[in-house]
Swiss-Prot record:
EC number: 7.1.1.-
Organism: Ipomoea purpurea (Common morning glory)
Keyword ATP-binding: no
Catalytic activity of the protein: a plastoquinone + NADH + (n+1) H(+)(in) = a plastoquinol + NAD(+) + n H(+)(out); a plastoquinone + NADPH + (n+1) H(+)(in) = a plastoquinol + NADP(+) + n H(+)(out)
GO molecular function list: NADH dehydrogenase (ubiquinone) activity; ubiquinone binding
NCBIfam families per UniProt: NDH_I_M (TIGR01972)
Gene Ontology biological-process annotations: ATP synthesis coupled electron transport; electron transport coupled proton transport
GO cellular component: chloroplast thylakoid membrane
Cellular location(s): Plastid, Chloroplast thylakoid membrane
InterPro entries cross-referenced by the UniProt entry: NADH_Q_OxRdtase_chain4, NADH_Q_OxRdtase_chainM/4, NADH_UbQ_OxRdtase, ND/Mrp_TM
Membrane topology, record value: Multi-pass membrane protein
Transmembrane segments: 3-23, 37-57, 84-104, 113-130, 134-154, 167-187, 208-228, 242-262, 274-294, 305-325, 330-350, 385-405, 416-436, 462-482
Name the UniProt record assigns to this protein: NAD(P)H-quinone oxidoreductase chain 4, chloroplastic
Amino acid sequence: MNFFPWLTIIVVFPIFAGSIVFFLPHKGNRVIRWYTLCICILELLITTYTFCFHFQVDDPLIQLEETYKWINFFDCHWRLGIDGLSVGPILLTGFITTLATLAARPVTRDSRLFHFLMLAMYSGQIGLFASRDLFLFFIMWELELIPVYLLLSMWGGKKRLYSATKFILYTAGGSIFLLMGVLGLTLYGSNEPTFNFETSVNQSYPAALEIIFYIGFFIAFAVKSPILPLHTWLPDTHGEAHYSTCMLLAGILLKMGAYGLIRINMELFPHAHSLFSPYLVIVGTIQMIYAALTSLGQRNLKRRIAYSSVSHMGFIIIGIGSMTDTGLNGALLQIISHGFIGAALFFLAGTTYDRIRLVYLDEMGGIAIQMPKIFTMFSSFSMASLALPGMSGFVAELLVFFGIISAKKYLFMSKILISFVMAIGIILTPIYSLSMLRQMFYGYKLFNAPNSSFLDSGPRELFLSISILLPVIGIGMYPDFVLSLSVEKVEVILSHFFYRQVL
């Protein structure tokens, strides 16, 4: 048995190493950029080594467990552990954060603080995915608020303060429900309050109280996911944030809410989840259609991509509500798939804006000839977004689709109706994606404009785009590479779920 604190090192290393950035030389930003990038690469290598040599894929139990006393009065411990649900999001966090650091090269104002905030987010995100203590989960959840708020309010567009304030109000409001739920779970049914996640999993709750807990946690996670109607902060945030920040938001932050729904709502409250799962499927289906139609009407490029993210999150919600192993595995695969695709689209949108200084689609057109590399990459990730066969999104959406069809909980006509509406959402995706490509790259508006000389993608942008495209294609061609991480854990969740239902 390995007692080396691998997870603690993985969690605390980025933020502690990032604090050194304030003591680096003042001359230029080159040293700061390279130092931060090296920290991210080293962290990713340590994480990959730990999971390759100290994690058993076929073991659904919690592995690499670490427990250290923290606050004795509340029995609050530093509890860390990983399983099949955690590994994928943690590796995704390391990969996207490393590339977002590379994408942040144009940031020159207050670069020390900028890169430190990115590393602080890195620690918070990994800490959340690895935490096995409810209070630690809440702390890591809240650790995201301040870095994201500062990244939004200090680096972004003209309305960045408005979008940052809207973000903090929504997420802080959701955090109140999360805190109330954590305290309620801790104080119920125990002589001594404990935040131990395992204790809460094995605890039975009265039906009414379980529903109240479920709703409280659901509101907190629905804000972060986001789920209708708590999604309105997302387009404003993406529309104003720097594209490296957008990569972290779309690639990782949104996935924290979906992870919380599976980790807490499904595992801790099976009876309530059984009651609310039909509503999750309905909301997810409506979200797909609504966000797709709204995306089609957006003039702002980044807002169009933001609404496409909301639409794709609908698949995750439907997969969680399907209560089948196929659907839940599809939802987990969609979390990873959209993490790559969403981050890449926002990066390419940002690099395009750096060159043409335009963000409205009706002002663009005709740049495909002048920027063929960016056109090729943008087209590739747009195809991945609309679930082209051979790309990761195709497998994820197909699994969710089959999951809802094979669900025994729902009536036959209900499944037919849901599948039909999902098919409409799938059809709407290429409409807004291909329309975006047509408005940006085709035509002659900018091609014939005076002084319309634009630089194409450089080595840095090309390397970053290809680095994301390769896993998207790899997962699309061999999805078992990701599914093998979660399939055993999903079976345990559902078997435990139905066992608790019988009791």
